[in-house]
Amino acid sequence: MSKNIIILSGDHVGPEVTAEAIKVLEAITQARPNVKFNFDHKLIGGAAIDATGSPLPDETLEASKKADAVLLGAVGGPKWGTGAVRPEQGLLKIRKELNLYANLRPCNFMSEKLLDLSPLRSEIVKGTNFTVVRELVGGIYFGTRKEDEGNGEAWDTEKYTVEEVKRITRMAAFLALQSNPPLPVWSLDKANVLASSRLWRKTVTETIEKEFPQLTLNHQLIDSAAMILIQNPSKMNGVIVTSNMFGDIISDEASVIPGSLGLLPSASLSSLPDKNTAFGLYEPCHGSAPDLPPNKVNPIATILSAAMMLRLSLNLKEEADAVEKAVSKVIDNGIVTADLKGASSTTEVGDAVAAEVQKLLK
């Protein structure tokens, strides 16, 4: 079985973390000779701007469209500043062009050892386990806008259609139904103020009631949800579904609960993973960390993103489970980078996870 994976290493620590994820994927092929990965490296972000003038070259986009999945490192950095052409524009464009409408970001603890690293007390965060499902190609980030043209006025537009909301609701429902019993669904909005949120709430309610009556649906205002995530995060265990901007903010808030951005993976999908072959782009939740010295970045988020890719896009569930178990074992053994109060290097963590994967798959 051969799978084609586009590698978009990006900027600064991006090449370092994708290299460790590739190392772990290659460990799978050594333990499973019938599995083969074809890696094709392409440019995105600042590296692409330097080489081509564009943050997303046509070659990168076309190659990504033909692949089974895309694994991305990180984009951006002070070198490219806030000019007219910015690395982040490449990310927004590839999401839109590949119709990656659903962003999945799990928030949990891969090891009990991580509880004491959370900025919240361990007794508050223990047992936290939810996934944020963020609508990724609609809303205010893609709405009509007007820049300030010297008159001191600028505006952006938040717009959603019923079909866009139905689509992301079905993704959240599908994920909730993967557990037995099904997980509760939490829908976050600002329906007490925004017309777009009132449409959101109405559509989510109707979709769940008509298509997924077995699911428990809870509505929460986004500001209230932000407080709950700090006061009692496990109260929102299950699947959280929300709009593009709210999802951007709430998932970043959630990302600090486990203690480090270097732990958290993400997946952006273009369809339901009902056959475990959905096309997706996978990336860590952290940025490009331009100030970090070489070989110091935590590669676990990217390695876990690769595990999500194995499960959702490449139909390799056993191998995905092995990677996640290997990560837990490595953390338990204290082989962690400085952000987790360890002394191991990027490559040492990658080596340890790869070795554990081979043991588990033998």
Swiss-Prot record:
Catalysed reactions, as listed in the record: (2R,3S)-3-isopropylmalate + NAD(+) = 4-methyl-2-oxopentanoate + CO2 + NADH
Binding sites annotated in the UniProt record for NAD(+): 77-88, 287-298
Pathway(s) the chain acts in: Amino-acid biosynthesis; L-leucine biosynthesis; L-leucine from 3-methyl-2-oxobutanoate: step 3/4
Cofactor descriptive note: Binds 1 Mg(2+) or Mn(2+) ion per subunit.
UniProt-listed Enzyme Commission number(s): 1.1.1.85
InterPro entries: IsoCit/isopropylmalate_DH_CS, IsoPropMal-DH-like_dom, Isopropylmalate_DH
One Gene Ontology MF term: NAD binding
Entry function: Catalyzes the oxidation of 3-carboxy-2-hydroxy-4-methylpentanoate (3-isopropylmalate) to 3-carboxy-4-methyl-2-oxopentanoate. The product decarboxylates to 4-methyl-2 oxopentanoate.
UniProt cross-references to PANTHER family, sorted A to Z: 3-ISOPROPYLMALATE DEHYDROGENASE
This protein's name: 3-isopropylmalate dehydrogenase
Source organism: Blastobotrys adeninivorans
Upper classification of the organism: Eukaryota, Fungi, Dikarya, Ascomycota, Saccharomycotina
